[in-house]
């Protein structure tokens, strides 16, 4: 059972949840907009309301079973506050209800029966905060000591050599190490994608779907500020702060550029010239359910099919940039086969110049030893690896 919930916070939570259950906009944006309109709520109250609405989204099927299938936001919040999702008789629930997943998603859940439910439970837990230490400015142990001196506890990441996991929810945005570019927020799984690319000093790299540029910054640092990292994205808004972030990180080798789409004519100047290309493709985001639990309710199988068509087009366009002997990494933050191995295997079948290279040995060469797997792909999830859900394939252009 959750701690006592004051009536005024219950009311705010119910109003906000009612908006979220329309599933018209991303939950985090809706929550931020609500708090801007209700600025009188203090930071602690905002945190409690936010935790409650996201808790309701994480456990929505169990709460609906407890409160009644047609229950409105008020009843769902009451069930949440009473801890109904924790005390139910699991035998009265279908497996999809136990997992708090829509039926279609549970039917496609890509883990074996012996771990499928445990993975689903792990995806319902709030995500921890991971940091990446900028190796151009600091060492992990020194950063850990400096944070500890400020009362911020961290532990070293399990896998990535520059990862730190923050204990609790301290305010970090104004910490000197964040301000001077010594640390960046980046999930440990995302950091492993940068290592899988294996960029070396002096190389020419393309981050094809760079987004806000977190992996571009990581790759630029791993190259010790040499070579060139072309950070491309279709959203100029998402790229807008990357130049300033790169400057703060001490990087002069990261070059952001907004492109029209994957077929932008300006990309042709790099055709066949790039050492390594990272494609962190737009996807369903179902590997980020710890952070974005609304995603499991806001989309269905048809959205996966649409995403797969776009992913195939992007992968094909990115492959044109890779020079013979170069590396192409295709990644998503989704566990779904339609967006992952199906896309890669169809691409390789049509492009015999590219071959899949096993991911785990490539990471092991960098001292990153993940649990062994028969798959040539990198697959991460919160149950087995304590990261977000990721898929990655490492391909080499043979000719």
Q: Which ranges hold each PLM region?
A:
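Class I Rossmann-like S-adenosyl-L-methionine
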Residues: 1-174
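Rossmann-like S-adenosyl-L-methionine
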Residues: 141-399
């Amino acid at each position: 059972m959750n701690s006592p919930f004051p009536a005024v916070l219950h009311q705010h939570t119910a109003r906000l949840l009612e908006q979220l259950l329309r599933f018209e906009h991303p939950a985090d944006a809706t929550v931020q907009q609500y708090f801007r309109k209700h600025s009188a709520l203090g930071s602690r109250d905002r945190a409690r309301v936010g935790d409650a609405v996201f808790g309701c989204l994480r456990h929505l099927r169990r709460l609906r079973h407890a409160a009644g299938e047609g229950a409105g936001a008020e009843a769902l919040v009451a069930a949440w506050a009473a801890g109904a999702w924790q005390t139910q008789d699991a035998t009265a629930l279908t497996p999809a209800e136990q997992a708090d997943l829509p039926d279609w998603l549970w039917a496609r859940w890509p883990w074996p029966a012996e771990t499928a439910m445990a993975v689903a439970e792990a995806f319902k837990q709030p995500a921890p905060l991971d940091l990446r230490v900028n190796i151009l400015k600091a060492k992990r142990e020194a950063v850990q000591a400096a944070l500890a001196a400020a009362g911020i506890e961290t532990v070293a990441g399990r896998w990535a050599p520059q990862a730190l996991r923050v204990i609790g929810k301290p305010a970090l945005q104004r910490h000197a190490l964040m301000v001077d570019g010594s640390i960046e927020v980046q999930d440990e799984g995302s950091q492993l994608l940068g290592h899988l690319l294996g960029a070396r000093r002096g190389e020419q790299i393309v981050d094809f779907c760079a987004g806000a540029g977190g992996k571009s910054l990581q790759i630029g640092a791993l190259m010790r500020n040499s070579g060139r990292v072309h950070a491309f994205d279709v959203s100029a808004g998402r790229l807008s702060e990357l130049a300033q972030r790169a400057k703060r990180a001490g990087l002069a080798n990261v070059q952001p550029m907004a492109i029209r789409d994957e077929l932008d004519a300006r990309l042709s100047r790099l055709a066949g010239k790039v050492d390594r290309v990272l494609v962190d493709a737009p996807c369903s985001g179902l590997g980020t359910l710890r952070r974005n639990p609304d995603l499991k309710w806001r989309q269905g199988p048809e959205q996966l099919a649409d995403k797969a068509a776009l992913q195939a087009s992007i992968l094909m366009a990115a492959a044109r940039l890779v020079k013979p002997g170069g590396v192409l990494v295709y990644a998503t933050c989704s566990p779904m086969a339609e967006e992952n191995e199906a896309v890669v295997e169809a691409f390789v079948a049509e492009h015999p110049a590219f071959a899949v290279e096993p991911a785990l040995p490539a990471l092991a060469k960098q001292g990153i030893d993940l649990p062994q797997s028969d798959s040539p792909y990198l697959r991460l999830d919160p149950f087995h690896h304590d990261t977000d859900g990721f898929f990655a394939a490492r391909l080499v252009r043979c000719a």
